[in-house]
Amino acid sequence: MKERVYILATVRKPSLIDAATLVFRTLRVGFPTAAVTVQTNWFAPGSHHAMAEACRQVDARLEEPGFITQHDRWIARLLETAHEPFWLCDTDVVFFGSMENLGIEGEPYMVGEYQPAFLEEFTRTIHVERLHTCLLWMDPVRLRDRVREWHSRFPDPPAVQAMRVLVHQTYVPTPRGVLFYDSGAGLYHAVGGTRMPDNALERFEHLNAATYIDLIAPALADAPALAEVHRQVYENPSRAKGLRAGQAEYYRRRAPSETIH
């Protein structure tokens, strides 16, 4: 059975089209045979043709639902409705090897790159640890079972959709500061997951913040340097190799003074 890949493509302004189409330049390196579905979201004028052509070149199905969504809402909806395992994939990912048939031991239900807790510059929050959604494998059936089990532990569970609560971005004020649960962080804290092994991590890189660099640049001390890295990768995707080491150093420098649970 072919693996499934879902991509949410957002182009808020024409200047971000490179970040929105980068993944398609190496997508079939990462997923040679997978069934790829791309959902359009918030397309700036003039960007539709570029996205449609990028999808055509890699034989990806382009879906245009006609409404705007948010990344976390989109993920939650997939988890609530899908019946087969799938990959989430961001548009600012570069592949260097195949991600198909990784052969993770045991019975995994969520596999991704571990992102440690760090002090987030843009929101001035403590960004809690999670499995990063830039490239995340999920088994929706097993995850729904895990979430139901987790939710049943409460004597009077609230009448809400637990999956949405755990997947949606959430800000939690505490005496020590605001905790930012980014997309899927609550799910990881509630039911856990599997950290992607090193031999899988070396097969891709992710351009952090590439699709929203314009929004956070005023808060970043090294915004010009980050933008230059992005520019070089758009020029030649192979230059993305090794970016993970720099991101790890960023996390180390901005690690919270206490462990976040």
Give each language-model segment a name.
Residues 13-29:
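Short, well-formed alpha-helical segments that are part of the catalytic scaffolds
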Residues 12-17, 44-45, 93-95, 142-145, ...:
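Short acidic, S/G/P-rich loop/turn micro-motifs used as interaction or catalytic elements
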Residues 2-12:
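Nucleotide-activated donor-dependent transferases that construct or modify glycoconjugates
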Residues 144-232:
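Catalytic core and acceptor-binding pocket of nucleotide-sugar-dependent glycosyltransferases
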Residues 3-5, 27-38, 60:
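Short loop->beta transition adjacent to catalytic acidic/histidine clusters or analogous donor-positioning motifs
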Residues 39-82:
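Active-site-proximal specificity loops/subdomain of glycosyltransferases
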Residues 84-96:
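Short beta-strand-to-loop acidic/aromatic patch adjacent to the donor-nucleotide binding site
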Residues 96-176:
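Conserved catalytic core of nucleotide-sugar-dependent glycosyltransferases
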